[in-house]
Amino acid sequence: MNLFSVPNSLAAAIASFGFAVLPALAAPDRAHVVNVYAWSDYFPPSVVEKFQAETGMHVNYTVFDSPDTAETALSVGSSNYDIVTMNASPHLAREIPKRFWKKLDQSQIPNARNADPQILKILGQVDPGNLYAVPWMWGTVGVIYNAEKAKSILGLLPAESLDLIFKKELAAKFEKCGISVLDSWQDILPLMARYLGQPQLSAEPAQLAAVLKKLEEIRPFLRRISTSGYYEQLADGELCLSIGYSGDAMIARRMAQEGGTKIPVDYAFPRVSVPLYIDSMVIPADSPNYAGALKFINFMMRPEISAEVTRFIGFASGNAAAVPFLDLSMRTNSIIYPPPEVRARFETERVYTSDELRTFNRAWQRFRTGE
C-alpha cells in the first residue's frame, strides 16, 4: 500500500502542528521520544497531539515515499526508529524471517484486541501468530475515475473496470484527459497478470513477456506513473483516470469538493480480483524506545482514535471497534468498507524470491522509462 509522499497538501499541516517531518533524531532523554517512520498522513496532527499531551512524550514523524525506501533505511541498522508502518506483503513477509522487527509484548497493548478479525487473519499469513504486527489501515487497488468524463467518453462503463486502462482501444479514448498508474510493480504487474488470466505473477519468460507486452501497448497513453500526487490531479482535473488506492480515491473526492472543482471522483473494484493491502504498525528490532512504541500502538488502537484517523484520511481502519465511531455515511461507504462479495475476491501478493525481485524490478524500470 499503499501511498503518499511529501510534498503533498498535508505536509504543511503536519509541520504546523508542532511535530517534526524530519529525520528521526536522538534526544537527551530518549525514553520520552517516539520516532515514527510512516506515510505522510497515517498519524494526523490531531491524534499525535493527543498522544503527546497524555503521555508527555514527543513524536518525531519521518515520512517515507515507498516501503522499499523504508526497508532500505532499516536494513542498514541503527535506524533510531520506534514505530514503522509497513505493508503485509511482500515486505513484512520477507522482513519477519530476517528479524527486522521486535516481538510485541501483548500485555502492554490490550487495545490490539480491537483488530478486525478478517484483516488479522490475512495478516497472520505473513505474521504467524500475529507476533510482530498490528493492523493499522487497509484498502484496495482499483480504478479511480472522473465519472462525468467517463460517461461523456464511453457512456456505460465496461463490466471489468481495468478495461478502461488495460485495453489500448479504451485507453486511447481517455489519453487527452489524463491517465496514470501507480509507480509500483508490486501493484501493477500482478494485477495485469491476473487480468490476462494468469493465476499469479510469474518470472517465467513467456508469462512475464505477455504481461509486459500488454503494458507496453498502453504506455503511450499514460500521462503519469506515480504513487504520490496523482489524487490531487484527479481532484483538479489534470487526470481523469487512474489505477490507484481506494483511500486515495476518497482523498481525491474530498479535495474536489473542498477545493471547488466539484469533480465527481468515483472508484471501481477490479472484477478479476481485488488486490488488498494491509499496512501495520511494527517496532524495529533496534528500537531505542520499545516501551514508548508499545504505548504509541496501544493509544492508536483505541477505537475513537483509530476512527479519527479514518475520518481524516479515508482509509479503512484495521480496528474493528473503530467502525461504530464513524458516521453512517462512512461506515456504509463501499469504497472504504467493501461489501462481502468484493471481500470474497481479496487477494494479497505472494512472497517473491530474490531472483524474481530483480527480474520484476528491472522489467518495471524499463517500462516506466519507456525503454
Report the location of each language-model feature.
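Paired acidic/hydrophobic, glycine-rich loop segments that form the ligand-binding mouth/hinge
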Residues: 81-86, 223-224, 240-245
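A ligand-binding cleft/hinge motif common to bilobed small-molecule-binding domains
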Residues: 90-94, 241-262
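Periplasmic-binding protein-like
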Residues: 208-217, 223, 261-287, 331
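Mature extracytoplasmic/periplasmic domains
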Residues: 279, 284-345
